[in-house]
Amino acid sequence: MIRQRGRVTAALFSAVALVAVSAPVAAAGGTGGARHGEHGGGASSVREWLDLLVEEDGVPGALAHQGRRSVTAGTAEPGSGRPMVGAEGRFRMGSNTKAFTAVAVMRLVADGRLRVDDRAGRYVPQLADSPITLRQLLKQRSGLPDYAGLVDWEKPLSDEGYLGLVLREDPLFEPGAEWGYSNTNYLVLGMVIARASGTDYRTYIERTVLEPLGLEDTYWPGPGELTLRGPHARNYGIHPLHPEQGRTDVTDLPAYEFFGASGGLVTTPGDLNAFWDGLFGGALLPRWAVRQMTHDTTDVGGRDVYPRGSRYGYGVASIPLTCGGRYWGHGGDLPGVSVGGGRATDGRGTVTVYTTTVAAQGARLAHLQGAVDAALCGRR
């Protein structure tokens, strides 16, 4: 359901042969996405990459936003004549939400209310007998299966209910032994935040992340809220409730009920860029906490959809740039949307690229990654 540059949850996208992911990551393993320097397609500028997504890959609409500049391609709604929305358009950020959740956890660590090596069972009774630590949850090393592949989309459950489904399954591996992307890790971290802070994780993230950065266009959908607020493009993909319909309009989705701390936030390109700038610019956490998020990492290059040289930390991933250096972000995919981008480490800026249908594998993924790379390498 959500994943870093690509993990689309198996349940969500089985109809289109996407293996569990969320994303940035998603729920299952993969063969890896476009490699460093191998985005393909022959494009060079951001606009050329977006045009490839629309003209060759069949993506209805695509946008790249960097600084005060937006580049768009395609339409906001096929058949309507509406141009693709610009920087004001809202979209579901998918697994980029994991970075917000990780920041909230590290805020509690900085305040002395959590330690990364605490056992999750100290805060989540269902895991009382498990050795899984918060560090392992943050780094996707817990071995917990992905709840996204187990849900009944006609019967939403509480977070405890989803975790209960997971605990009936065999673990993917012993905690800490391997790396395996799973939305369940951040489902559990949302529960930890609630217990440690004494308030719902949505409220805590609003108070400690959204409000300090002034992210007024970023929000958690409420219970039963299916439509996006404000201006937005329509989204197209396989609807989890009606996979037999094939590709259809999936703009309206039950985000509150299913995506939560793993992928439930709605945002705009400007707000998401402001988040990355705020996080890596020191506006949200002490410097040591950001350093821990980005230095306690696992090599995930060539796994899932990560290019060679990528590393996964605490809800953030670093991806190499063809012009040298790297950028930190996360990425995310849901039915009808893929999001890439982040902040370069050497002052080259911050960018968000998103499409109005899933671009989590093959040429689409390569072209989306190419647009991010072109923007951060100055090839506009």
Which sequence ranges carry the predicted segments?
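Catalytic loop of the DD-peptidase/beta-lactamase superfamily, centered on the K-T-G motif
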Residues: 2-6, 27-71, 247-380
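Sec-dependent signal peptide hydrophobic core
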Residues: 5, 9-14
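Bacterial N-terminal signal peptides
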Residues: 13-21
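Hydrophobic membrane-targeting alpha-helices
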Residues: 20-25, 108
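Primarily hydrophobic membrane-targeting regions of prokaryotic envelope proteins
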Residues: 49-53, 65, 93-113, 119, ...
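Short active-site loop at a secondary-structure junction
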Residues: 57-60, 80-137, 173-182, 260
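Structural recognition of the beta-strand scaffold that forms the well-ordered cores
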Residues: 63-65, 92, 136-138, 180, ...
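Short, surface-exposed loop or secondary-structure junction motifs
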Residues: 77, 131-327
